[in-house]
């Protein structure tokens, strides 16, 4: 079947169905007529440099556009909402050339939030709703572990922070031999 009941909630039963549903919902006219999608579509060529996805620039632009459009929101926001906004922005940029995997499972049964595959290069993105510095540091450590698992040197973290005095932007963090590019919106 398409769905299963787990812990009293309905879940998509299969990763293929889940990806197809994400793709379907991201292609609906009302979604593609939204401001985030249009901004990404207009500027999509700037994110490809020498056949590679410029993830740092993508996060920088996403941060600016998200803050301009949704920055005043303080309503209930969950990690899944952030993933949808980011995927909506990402879709026209990688469309036809790249792909993404949502909550890809590692052999030790951990789940990465998003893996982008663009022309054979993988980019791991961890997304979090801000719940304080300690929680954020655990997310950074989790991303470092994913990078270790996938034998990558650089990973990306996107934090959705709804504090009034947050510092919006993109910064680089070194953890051992890994580089984390972290965006805060």
Label every model-predicted segment:
Residues 97-103:
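Conserved RecA-like helicase motor-core motifs
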Residues 1-95, 113, 119:
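C-terminal leucine-rich, beta-strand-based interaction scaffolds used for sensing/assembly
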Residues 173-185:
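Intrinsically disordered, low-complexity terminal regions enriched in charged/polar residues
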Residues 104-109:
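A short beta-turn/loop motif at secondary-structure boundaries
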Residues 136-140, 147-176:
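Nucleic-acid nuclease catalytic cores
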Residues 86, 114-116, 120-131, 146:
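Conserved catalytic cores of phosphodiester-cleaving nucleases, focusing on short active-site segments
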Residues 129-135, 156, 182:
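Conserved RecA-like P-loop NTPase helicase motor core
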């Amino acid at each position: 079947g398409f769905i299963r009941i787990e812990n009293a909630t309905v879940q998509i039963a299969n990763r293929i169905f889940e990806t197809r549903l994400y793709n379907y919902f991201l292609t609906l006219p009302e979604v593609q007529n939204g401001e985030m999608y249009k901004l990404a579509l207009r500027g999509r060529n700037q994110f490809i440099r020498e056949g590679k996805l410029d993830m740092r620039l993508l996060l920088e632009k996403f941060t600016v556009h998200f803050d301009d459009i949704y920055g005043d929101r303080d309503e209930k926001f969950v990690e899944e909402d952030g993933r949808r906004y980011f995927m909506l922005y990402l879709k026209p940029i990688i469309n036809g050339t790249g792909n993404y995997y949502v909550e890809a499972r590692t052999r030790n049964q951990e789940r990465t939030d998003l893996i982008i595959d663009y022309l054979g290069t993988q980019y791991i993105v961890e997304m979090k709703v801000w719940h304080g510095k300690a929680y954020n540091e655990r997310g950074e450590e989790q991303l470092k572990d994913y990078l270790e698992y996938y034998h990558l040197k650089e990973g990306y973290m996107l934090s959705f922070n709804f504090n009034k005095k947050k510092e919006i932007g993109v910064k680089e963090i070194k953890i051992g031999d890994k580089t984390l590019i972290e965006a805060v919106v």
